[in-house]
Amino acid sequence: MKKLIMVLMALLVCAVAFAALDFTEVDALYLTDEHDQEVYDKLTVMLEQATEGEEKANVLWRLSRVCVDLGDAIDKSDKKARFAIYEEGEQYALDSIAAYPTAQGYLWKCSNIGRWGQTKGVFDSLAKAKPMVQDLEVMIDDLGCLDSSEAWYVLAVLYDSLPGKPISFGNSNAAISYGRIACDTIPRNVIYGGTYKQLAEMLWNRNWNAKKRASEISKMQKNWDKETSNIEKYKYYEGANGAQAYPLWTKTALSSMTDRQEAVVILKYAQAVFEGRKTHTQADVDNYNEIAALLKEWT
């Protein structure tokens, strides 16, 4: 009997040792946007408990993800500290991909590199731009991840920030298309006001009238139908359903409004999304205030 109890206890210990890690608590904590250091600390403990392969990769990309937020919280004047945390986040993502390639690993690698580049300055970080797109190409084309609002947002910001040819591959129309799919794929459990704001600002700056929109969007539709690679195809997402399509935030067709009219509608829609939620992160509040300021400036 005593031997049986010892065997059962040994089996129980083994079962606990090999039990899969539960990310429910740490993911919920991350979404509050208020406990990033606690999330980081919990994940470093989980990393030591993780088994090799997929489980370890899932801890590592979460560490990479929270590094973006930790870096964003550092004063912008302290570039050295920001560089350090973004580089740490990039390394976690690289280790995650090495352990088990996932879309999240590639996404958060690019996000940390992107933040590093924004801190450094566009012209000082041009060399990192193409590798970022190549990583996102793996995520979107090879791994088939088409519903990541964050990935499309990274592409939108990248194409909007970079200079165009011959210096680099910046393209405002591609940026707007990527911005549209970023908005269309925002998960229901988050607000992402900054994503709506980014698209609105890009449209405001492009400033096409309704006639030009109708003409150019029809051309985009032809390219959309022709392209086969997802990352190339979605450069023309604005024309996916033609100039008579209705975007998420209005019952007015794309061809019946100007860029700036739509930009204002998008910001008002983002305000309504925020006001319809009971809980908000600090980032949500900050984005809401910035959107209100833009609307005051534009209207």
Where are these regions (language model features)?
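A contiguous pocket-lining binding segment that forms or flanks enzyme active sites
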Residues: 135-142, 150-155, 161-167, 171-194
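Positively charged n-region of N-terminal signal peptides that target proteins for export
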Residues: 1-4
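Alpha-helical junction/boundary sensor with strong preference for TPR arrays
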Residues: 47-50, 54, 67, 74, ...
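Amphipathic alpha-helical repeat scaffolds of TPR domains
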Residues: 20-31, 53-76, 100-120, 145-163, ...
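Helix-turn-helix repeat elements of alpha-solenoid scaffolds
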Residues: 30-46, 78-94, 125-135, 169-178, ...
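Bacterial N-terminal signal peptides
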Residues: 7-15
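TPR/TPR-like (Sel1-like) alpha-helical repeat modules
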Residues: 127-137, 170-183, 217-232, 252-278
